[in-house]
Amino acid sequence: MTSVAVYWAPGCHLCEPVKATARAVCAELGVELREIDITGDDGLEAQYRASLPLVEIDGRRAFKYHLDEGEFRRRLARAGA
């Protein structure tokens, strides 16, 4: 089953629109979505802070900063969603 992870943090002005698009598309396609707040996790903050929001599809980085809905749908289709 295809899965999507969105890494985000409070105060990230780019994160909310990315999360909203990911939620809508994943709900429509029945794709598992995890929204991961990196706040307070030193390892995640070190790894992702400069790249927020970051979207992974099946554990692979797919989008950074912005989420193009059309390209997101195409990549999910290629992943089997």
What are these regions (language model features)?
Residues G59-A81:
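Non-catalytic, surface beta->alpha helical segment in thiol-disulfide oxidoreductase systems
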Residues R49-V55:
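Structural micro-motif
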Residues V31-D42:
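Thiol-based oxidoreductase modules, predominantly thioredoxin-like and allied folds used
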Residues M1-A24:
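Local sequence-structure signature of Cys/Sec-based thiol-disulfide redox active-site neighborhoods
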Residues E45:
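Chalcogenol-based redox active-site neighborhoods
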Residues M1-S3, A24, E28, R73-A81:
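Short, low-complexity, intrinsically disordered N-terminal peptides in bacterial proteins
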Residues A5, R34, A62:
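Short, flexible active-site loop motifs that bind/organize anionic cofactors or intermediates
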